[in-house]
């Protein structure tokens, strides 16, 4: 459940279209996965990719990343573009948006099942099967436990939300009372 910056989404779309055109989507996805791990490592060190790129060391960051992770030419040139446009800070969001582009292209929707306790795999599969038939797409569901909903479930995917929780029912009831009185 990420709220992404429009700049990140735009860059991800551009990268995805080029990867499709060159038929290297899986390689670019693999490169971005490696870069994501590198960014996580930097975050633990309280550093950012942008900061390292600005350092006046003799090493070229993009060449280092390319040789260390074996990046393909598209990913390498894309990183150079981000560096040139001072957009390296968006890389983690671009990776998330790129993954969303790939899932959409493959006909996969990511969803969240919010419940008060962890559901069994078979119960999740039942919900998943119902919504896959409704959406006519493959659905990947993550079960999130949130005791604040009191009871029931909330299912979120794309821009949709089915709130069948007790808290949701109480809030809808409150709204109706306020409208009528």
Curated annotation (Swiss-Prot):
Entry membrane topology: Peripheral membrane protein
The name this protein goes by in its record: ATP synthase subunit delta
Subcellular location: Cell inner membrane
HAMAP family noted in UniProt: ATP_synth_delta_bact (MF_01416)
Main location: membrane
Originating organism: Orientia tsutsugamushi (strain Boryong) (Rickettsia tsutsugamushi)
Any matching Pfam family: OSCP
Keyword Membrane applies: yes
Subunit organization: F-type ATPases have 2 components, F(1) - the catalytic core - and F(0) - the membrane proton channel. F(1) has five subunits: alpha(3), beta(3), gamma(1), delta(1), epsilon(1). F(0) has three main subunits: a(1), b(2) and c(10-14). The alpha and beta chains form an alternating ring which encloses part of the gamma chain. F(1) is attached to F(0) by a central stalk formed by the gamma and epsilon chains, while a peripheral stalk is formed by the delta and b chains.
Gene of this entry: atpH
């Amino acid at each position: 459940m990420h709220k992404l910056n429009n700049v990140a989404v735009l860059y991800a779309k551009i990268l995805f279209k080029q990867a499709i055109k060159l038929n290297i989507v899986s390689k670019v996805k693999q490169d971005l996965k490696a870069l994501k791990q590198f960014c996580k490592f930097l975050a633990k060190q309280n550093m950012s990719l942008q900061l390292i790129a600005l350092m006046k060391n003799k090493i070229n960051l993009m060449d280092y990343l390319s040789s260390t992770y074996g990046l393909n030419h598209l990913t390498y040139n894309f990183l150079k573009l981000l560096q040139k446009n001072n957009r390296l800070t968006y890389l983690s969001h671009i990776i998330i948006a790129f993954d969303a582009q790939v899932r959409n292209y493959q006909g996969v929707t990511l969803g969240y099942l919010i419940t008060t306790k962890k559901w069994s795999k078979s119960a999740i599969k039942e919900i998943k099967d119902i919504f896959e038939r409704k959406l006519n797409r493959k659905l990947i569901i993550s079960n999130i436990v949130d005791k604040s909903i009191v009871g029931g479930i909330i299912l979120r995917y794309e821009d949709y939300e089915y709130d069948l929780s007790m808290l949701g029912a109480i809030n809808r009831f409150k709204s109706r009372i306020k409208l009528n009185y």
